Structures are given as C-alpha cells and as structure tokens.
Amino acid sequence: MEGEELETTGSLSEVFQPEVTMAVTGEPPKPAEEELEEEEEETSPEVIDTLSLLDVLRVSAIMEDIIDQLSILGYIIPVQYERRQSLSQKTSHEGAPMVPSTPKISASLIAKDKPVVSDSKQRGQDFFFKKATKQTTMTLETMRKIQNDRQYFSDVIANAMMEMQACGSFSSLLEALGKERDAKMNFHDVITREGKGRKQIKSLQKQLVDVKRERQMQVQNGNEYIAHLRDQLQEVKAKTNLENLYMKRNTELQVSQTQKKCNRAEELLLEEIEKLRLKTEEENRVHMEIEMFLRNQQQKLEEKLEFWMEKFDKDTEAKQNELNALKAAKASDLAHLQDLAKMIREYEQVIIEDRLEKEKTRKKLEQDDLELRSIVKLQAWWRGTVVRREIGSFKMPKKEKDDSKDAKGKEKDKRRGKK
C-alpha cells in the first residue's frame, strides 16, 4: 500500500509545476519547526500586503495552470480506477468460495477424529487468501484517496486564486496548509495506534493458538468421555430390554385381571339397568296418577278463580261508588274550607287595621304628653328668667346704698361661683 501511494504521489508531482508541489509524507513536525511555522504565519500578512500586481498575475497564472492539469488528471484516472475495480470484483468472486471452505474442512476432520492440519499450513493459507482480498481493497482505497486529494487540492488552489485576484492575499491557502498539518499529525497518531493494535493482535493470535491447543485437548477428552458413555449406553440398553420384558409380562397379567374385573362390572351394570327399568316403569305409573290428580285440582282452581273474579268485579264496583262519594264529599269540604279561609283572611285584615289604628292613637298620646311636658318646662324656665332678671312686675324694692353694694357683691360672688 505504501509503495502504491508513493507511485501515485510521484505521478502527481510530475504533472504539477515544481514551484507549487508539496509533500504530505514524513515525520511529524518538531516543536522548533512548529515555532518557525507559527512565526511564518504571523509574518505572512506583511508579505501578502507587499505583493505587487505583477506577482499576483504570475501566481494566478501558475494556479490556473495547476487547476487545468488537475482537471486533466481527473479525466485520466477514472479509466484505471474502473479497470482495477473490475479486477478486484473478479478476484473477490474467485476467492469467495475458497475462504469459507476451511472451517467446513476443519469441522469434518474433527467429526471423523482424523489428524488435523498443522498450524503453519493453516496460517499460510489464511495469509494467502487475506493478502489477495487486502490488495484489491487497498487499491480501491488508494484510488479513492487520490481522487479525493486531487479534488481537494483543486478546490484549495481555486479558492486561493480567487482570493489572490480579489484582495492580493492567499490566507485561505495558509489555512488549508494548517488543516493538512493537523491532519498529518492525526495520521501519525493513527499509525502509532495501529502499531499498538498490531502488537495486540499478535498477542491475541498467540493466545488463540493456546486456546486451539486447549480445545484439541478438550476434544480428545470429550472423545474418551463419549466412548465411556457408549459403554454405559450398552449397559443401559441391556437393562432396558430386561425391564421391557418384565413390563410386558406384567402388563399382560394386569390386562387379564382388568378384563375379569370389567366382565364382573358389566354383569353388575346389567343388573343395575334392569332395576332402573323397573323403577322407571313404576315412576311412569305414578306420574300418570299425579297428572290426573293435578288436572282435577286445576279444574277446581279454575272454578274458584272464576268465583273470585266475579267477586272482585262486584267489590271493585262497590269501592268505586264509595270513592265517587268520597270525592264529592271532598269537593264540598274543599269549598267550605275555601269560604272559611276567605273569612279568616278578612278577619286578619280587620285585626291588622285595628292594631294600626291603636298604634297611631298611642303615638299621638305620647306626642301630646311630650309636648305638654315641654311646654311646662318652657313656662317654668321663662318664669325663672323673669324673676331673676326682674322683668315686668317682678321688680324688687330699692334699699340703701350699702345694702345695694353688699347685694351687688354677693350677686357677683354668686355669679362667679356659678361660672
């Protein structure tokens, strides 16, 4: 696979221009190289800014040439790819019936207890078949990878050319290179993991050989155990033959005994049948007598029923007459009750009017009493004020000055005390 990849990369490098070819194989970049690349990436914008129009035209022409060569290569490669695909299909059809035949052969050899094929021959055959299928799949994968890489490279160059023509820079190309660098680092990680996986596969193959040996020992022990079981089977067959003979004789005796029992039971059943026949005849006779008795009773009951039906009609007619009389009495009582209710309502109205009249007279008497008391109080107040103020004919006679002064002083004191 690695040789084919190198051949394809070499053919691509011959078609491309020497100024733009770049390798994607080799060891992963070291830390120092990564630092240099980061510095170049940091300084690249300055270089891009200083590109002249002539440099842009030159680089654009080179990129157009690269795109044309890649498109031509895309039209050339599919012919070889289809041929290899048809060859891989033929080899897969030829090798398909051979691969699954090995487990059938090994299974038949184990079943017949024949010597098994050696591990070295078996490994050689497996390696031969696996190698044929692996080569076909690897060629198909390689061609697919070449086509994908060509298309990706063509897209990157086209984007870079468009950016170069638009703004005179190629930052998309630098971004694509960074992505490829990351992909290469991941590829190397995958290779290291694949190496570890191969080592693990080798250890597992060794374990598989040990397991096969253990299985062969187990098969041998199983064959010995099968032989032992066959001997036991022969002994069991002999015992079962004796047991079958004994069971046959025993069953014959049981059949004869059961046959005798069945004959005896049949005789008993016949006697029982005869008894039951006599009993059924007697029951039929009794049934006929009971039927005659029941018919007589039915006739008597029908006569009684007719009597009671006539009596029922008469009683219902009498009760209906009583009911009509009660309804008439109820109607008259209802009219009388309505008259009484009307009279009671009139009396209630009279009583209510009398009570209202009494209430009015009581309120009027209370009002007259209240007015009389108010008038008496007002007259008493007026008389008191007239006497105190000496209004009209209620003036007091004049005395000496001293007496008048004393009286005035006393009146003032009284007024102050009242206040």
UniProtKB/Swiss-Prot annotation:
**Highest taxon listed in the record's lineage:** Eukaryota
Q: Where is this region: Disordered?
A: 1-47, 393-419
Tell me, which GO biological process terms does this entry list?
cilium organization; sperm axoneme assembly; spermatid development
Residues annotated as domain IQ = 371-400
Q: Does the keyword Cytoplasm apply?
A: yes
The molecular function terms of the Gene Ontology recorded here are: calmodulin binding; Hsp70 protein binding
Q: Name its cellular compartments.
A: Cytoplasm; Cell projection, Cilium, Flagellum; Cell projection, Cilium; Cytoplasm, Cytoskeleton
- Write down the InterPro entries for this protein, in alphabetical order: IQ_motif_EF-hand-BS, IQCG
Q: Which Pfam families match?
A: IQ
Stretches of Acidic residues bias are at: 34-44
What are the protein's UniProt keywords?
Calmodulin-binding, Cell projection, Cilium, Cytoplasm, Cytoskeleton, Differentiation, Flagellum, Spermatogenesis
Q: Which GO terms describe its cellular component?
A: cytoplasm; cytosol; manchette; motile cilium; sperm flagellum
Query: Keyword Cytoplasm: yes or no?
Result: yes
Query: Where the protein is mainly located, per its record?
Result: cytoplasm
What does it do? Component of the nexin-dynein regulatory complex (N-DRC), a key regulator of ciliary/flagellar motility which maintains the alignment and integrity of the distal axoneme and regulates microtubule sliding in motile axonemes. Binds calmodulin when cellular Ca(2+) levels are low and thereby contributes to the regulation of calcium and calmodulin-dependent protein kinase IV (CAMK4) activity; contributes to the regulation of CAMK4 signaling cascades. Required for normal axoneme assembly in sperm flagella, normal sperm tail formation and for male fertility.
Family listed: Belongs to the DRC9 family.
Q: What does the UniProt entry state concerning the protein's domains? A: The IQ domain mediates interaction with calmodulin when cellular Ca(2+) levels are low.
Note the subunit structure: Component of the nexin-dynein regulatory complex (N-DRC). Interacts (via IQ domain) with CALM when calcium levels are low. Does not interact with CALM in the presence of Ca(2+). Interacts with the HSP70 proteins HSPA1L and HSPA8. May form a complex with CAMK4 and HSP70.
Under PANTHER family, the record lists: DYNEIN REGULATORY COMPLEX PROTEIN 9
- The name under which this protein is listed is Dynein regulatory complex protein 9
State the organism of origin: Rattus norvegicus
